Curated annotation (Swiss-Prot):
EC number: 3.2.2.22
PROSITE patterns on file: SHIGA_RICIN
A Gene Ontology BP annotation from the UniProt entry: defense response
Reactions the enzyme catalyzes: Endohydrolysis of the N-glycosidic bond at one specific adenosine on the 28S rRNA
SUPFAM superfamilies referenced in this protein's UniProt entry, alphabetically: Ribosome inactivating proteins (RIP)
Positions of disulphide bridges: C34-C258, C84-C105
Residues carrying sugar: N10
Protein name, entry field: Ribosome-inactivating protein PD-L3/PD-L4
Keyword Glycoprotein: yes
Length: 261
């Protein structure tokens, strides 16, 4: 399993762009593309996981473990009292849990568990963060940097603190890798905090559906219109691959052939 490192504490727009490119290249199936957009592999391709190590300005780190075939965050690790401390979402199966534990913290003599006692769904994370929508949780490099420091090496923290970190990290890492539009939102707002707009949320919620629609398109036309949201919350109807292609980073895995260019 390979580790992609991102120095959040010394980040620039270019370094973030390079991080995104590295993550996409590490995760994608080198043989799959639809309309020029790279696709994630099916769940059998090894390595099955990707690690993303985030470092803050004071060199504290948190390592996220992503399932390669869909970029879902399964858990994370930090260094606590000189030991590798691992945290796993409670909706991860026992088989995968063992994988997470052994991948994040390979040394069984120097590790300890601090469970995430809730699941990885956005609705749950929002609830734990005390918001009705993740549009209320600001994203940004400084926020990610300070969130790392609230968890890494800290003995106790609230579910709220942890869920806020996870909402920020999942969107700035996994969602930004899936969607160039989200990566570009981070870059456009690089030196300030920002609230994810309705288009960001709409893309996040429809990634599977969008991937399927692009995969099944005929000569660039979708077989049925996709109804999404614009940044200003108006309805966005997508009829052709070209209309959404600039926003895409990676497609979710869909079996069967598609038009590659």
């Amino acid at each position: 399993v390979n580790t992609i490192t991102f120095d959040v504490g010394n980040a620039t727009i270019n370094k973030y762009a390079t991080f995104m490119e590295s993550l996409r290249n590490e995760a994608k199936d080198p043989t799959l593309k639809c309309y020029g957009i790279p696709m994630l592999p099916d769940s059998n391709l090894t390595p099955k996981y990707v690690l993303v190590k985030l470092q803050d300005a004071s060199s504290k780190t948190i390592t996220l473990m992503l399932r390669r075939n869909n970029l879902y965050v399964m858990g994370y690790s930090d260094l606590y009292n000189g030991k590798c401390r691992y945290h796993i979402f409670n909706d991860i199966s026992s088989t995968e849990s063992t994988d997470v534990e052994n991948t994040l913290c390979p040394n069984s003599n120097s590790r300890e568990k601090k469970a995430i006692n809730y699941n990885s769904q956005y609705s749950t994370l929002q609830n734990k963060a005390g918001v009705s929508s993740r549009s209320q949780v600001q994203l940004g490099i400084q926020i990610l940097n300070s969130d790392i420091g609230k968890i890494s090496g800290v003995s106790t923290f609230t579910d709220k603190t942890e869920a806020e970190f996870l909402l920020v990290a999942i969107q700035m890492v996994s969602e930004a890798a899936r969607f160039k539009y989200i990566e570009n939102q981070v870059k456009t707002n690089f030196n300030r905090a920002f609230n994810p707009n309705p288009k960001v949320l709409s893309l996040e919620e429809n990634w599977g559906k969008i991937s399927l629609a692009i995969h099944n398109a005929k000569n660039g036309a979708l077989t049925s219109p996709l109804e999404l949201k614009n940044a200003d919350d108006t309805k966005w109807i997508v009829l052709r691959v070209d209309e959404i292609k600039p926003d895409m980073g990676l497609l979710n895995y869909v079996s069967g052939t598609c038009q590659t260019t």
